[in-house]
Amino acid sequence: MENEKTEKKKKDRTPKTWKTCEIIQQLEYMSAEDVESGLDHNAIKNYAYILHDKDVNDDGSPKAAHWHIYIRFKDSTPTDSICKWFGITSNYIGRIQGRFADALAYATHKNVSSKYQYLDEEVKSNFDFVKERDTARSREADKQRKAEIADLIINGVIREYNYTCLLYTSP
């Protein structure tokens, strides 16, 4: 009885519809053809996917080859539909942590330097994923720089008489 309640709670956490999602599935259970046919639906606005076949575990042993599939839908799309398209159960569909661009960065591990760095060319997408990823990363860098400058002003490092020297010098 307790186990049934726990199982029901887990199922209830899965959204009924998705605007964006990530699917992670081992190559052993999903072929490239399965991925492509799953993505061949009008409800999908943008997608990007990559096969991670060079990842390693903490102990250095190779991880099983697996797909990372990132999808942005035109409208909210039911979980059941996504499951049918890819031949998976709902537990393989996950929320994208952060923004869609963050997921795109993770596709090649651009945002995790300690992991194997995949080439941009290994990502298959129906849009310019590099441009979207890099634009978002540039915006984030701008925000961080503005915060850094604000801290320097607050702490008295940047003053009226020295701001040009500190802010406009070439690296």
Where is each model-derived feature located?
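DNA replication initiation modules
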Residues: 74-146
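Residue-level recognition of strand-loop junctions within catalytic nucleotide-signaling folds
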Residues: 74, 159-162
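Conserved small/polar residues in nucleotide/adenosyl-binding loops
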Residues: 168-171
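Signature for HUH/AEP ssDNA processing cores
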Residues: 1-65, 72-77, 81
